[in-house]
Amino acid sequence: MINYSKPRGTIDLYNKEMNDFKLLENFLLSTTKRYGFQQIKTPVFEFAELFMKSAGESSDLVSKEMYLFKDKSDRWLALRPEGTAGVIRAVVENKLLLNHPLPLKLMYFEPCFRYERPQAGRQRQFHQFGVEVLGTKNIYYDFELIALADTILKKLMISNYILEINYISSPHNRSLWVKSLQEYFHLHRTELTPLSQERITTNPLRILDDKLESQKLVVKQAPKISHFLSNEEKEEFNLIKKMLDDYNIKYYVNEGLVRGLDYYSGLVFEFISTSPKLLGQSTIIGGGRYGELIKQTGGPNYEGIGFGIGIERLLIALSETNKNILNTDDDKYLIAFFDKELENEAIKLTQILRINNQLNVDIILSSTKADKIFKLAQRLNVKKLIILAKKEWSDKKIILKDLLNFKQDLLSLDEIKGIR
């Protein structure tokens, strides 16, 4: 007999983990909706060229991590490795920037796939929540997105994080910086790994982005992008920093921060968890501005800015707060009966509370003893227990037990039906 198991780098969600996952999804969608974002859904796979062009063929995402396959028409497709490129493709294809007031503000919550070595906070199938503001150069939105990300973490009572920011220049000034990096790293190539030596020619920014290489002194002393910014770009970066200062959002300028995707040009930022549970995979929110991506995808010459949140990492960071922040669901009720002849009455009451009162109600469809009912209620994380017992029912009474506060009341049927 074959024993099937899930593929490496994937997880099964159920019980509390599934509940927390859905609550976090609902929290993120409802929070960003108040900022004027509307949800978009895109296919789980796209033509591979979309990601190759947007992320850059020399990026780890494209060269090592994408799940590629050919369809029956011999076309290369890829499972979605990140959310932004697919959203931009959908916006361009459906002409949303031409038929919608600008800026266009979109959010998404989607599964993504990357072939990486699994560890805490890094799976081969993971979930990404993201927002994109499209069709505006106004740097207020750079500030707004950082403020939104900061608000999300604060509302979740996550405090063990730092915010790092940097400014990646325009394509022209960036090319001058890249040339300077290539000259510098050629002089120090023996201090780099073989992979980084290859990247000197293909894309030296990936050396700065490499978690191990970035810790080396030779990489830390590499030419900085700030030396290649125009006066206008410096002024723009200073204005963003001033807005963050004015609203008491603490940040650190990290000139080695370039993000792992080639489409960024302008502000880039990362919210980095200091949780020991996420060592090595500590970025929980990352994003930035992209000036060329929409045009590269066949759309108008508009800019955009966005960020993505790794849901699995955020849940790990959230678990350290020791507070049940997400548990905002309505009370869960469990209906039980001690005597078989009360089964139909219990079923009727279950349906009334579900349909008329819109309560979260489950039922035990067998008469059983009290201790078994209480054990089951505990396993199901039930807060309120409604019990139909023969003696109390003869007096038109029903037992309501508050398992959270260890209280018990005898209520009439009308009082039970009045629960909201």
Swiss-Prot record:
Subcellular location: Cytoplasm
Pfam families: tRNA-synt_His
Keyword annotations of the record: Aminoacyl-tRNA synthetase, ATP-binding, Cytoplasm, Ligase, Nucleotide-binding, Protein biosynthesis
UniProt subunit comment: Homodimer.
Primary location: cytoplasm
SUPFAM superfamilies: Class II aaRS ABD-related, Class II aaRS and biotin synthetases
GO biological process: histidyl-tRNA aminoacylation
Entry keyword annotation includes Cytoplasm: yes
GO MF annotation list: ATP binding; histidine-tRNA ligase activity
Entry's family note: Belongs to the class-II aminoacyl-tRNA synthetase family.
GO cellular component: cytoplasm
Protein name as it appears in the record: Histidine--tRNA ligase
